[in-house]
């Protein structure tokens, strides 16, 4: 048993997630990155439904995975005057009718939704340089991603990759290819941390 509970809690974020009954994390790894407490894990969301079999009259549960992704939390050791959440635009936006902040960067606004409780402050936090760096990382992401920055400096990064950290998949990659992929995926996450570390 691990005496230290996980730092990362997917339900503690403003990141929009699919409807689900159960949220579970696995493969927690905690460490430091450039002096920042950091934790990564695999998050799985499942939807559980019950149905009754006509033949037997017995109730059964059906569990369906609706989301699997790689998540990282980094404590940036600084405070921010407000929170922000960035998540990808998609067809569901019209259904949710979520209010999104326009940044003035056409490419960023086409690709991402942005929410916060203070539009003026969030646009200072999300400087033009930060937006360009996020757009550059979007080009090399392993899936659709979302970012949630809390006022206390906790930075959540979630990638809907369909697999977890260090999954070997179907065994098509040799050990050298696996190491290279694992390093590339971790580097992507640390590059996103770097976007929010500087002024």
PLM regions and their residue ranges:
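Charged, low-complexity intrinsically disordered regions
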Residues: 1-199
């Amino acid at each position: 048993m691990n005496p230290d509970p996980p730092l990362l809690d997917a339900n503690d974020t403003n990141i929009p997630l699919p409807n689900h009954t159960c949220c579970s994390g696995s493969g927690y790894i905690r460490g430091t990155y450039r002096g920042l407490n950091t934790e990564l894990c695999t998050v799985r969301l499942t939807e559980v439904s019950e149905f009754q079999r006509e033949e037997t009259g017995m109730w059964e549960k059906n569990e369906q995975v609706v989301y699997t992704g790689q998540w990282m939390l980094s404590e940036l050791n600084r405070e921010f005057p407000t929170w922000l959440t960035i998540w990808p635009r998609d067809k569901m936006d019209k259904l949710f009718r979520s209010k999104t902040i326009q940044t003035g960067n056409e490419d960023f606004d086409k690709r991402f939704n942005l929410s916060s409780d203070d539009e003026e402050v969030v646009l200072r936090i999300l400087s033009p340089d930060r937006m360009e760096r996020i757009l550059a990382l979007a080009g090399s992401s392993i899936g659709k991603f979302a970012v949630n920055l809390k006022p206390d400096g906790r930075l959540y990064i979630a990638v809907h990759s369909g697999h977890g950290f260090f999954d070997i998949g179907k065994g098509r990659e040799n050990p050298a290819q696996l190491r290279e992929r694992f390093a590339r995926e971790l580097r992507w996450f640390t590059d996103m941390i770097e976007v929010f570390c500087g002024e």
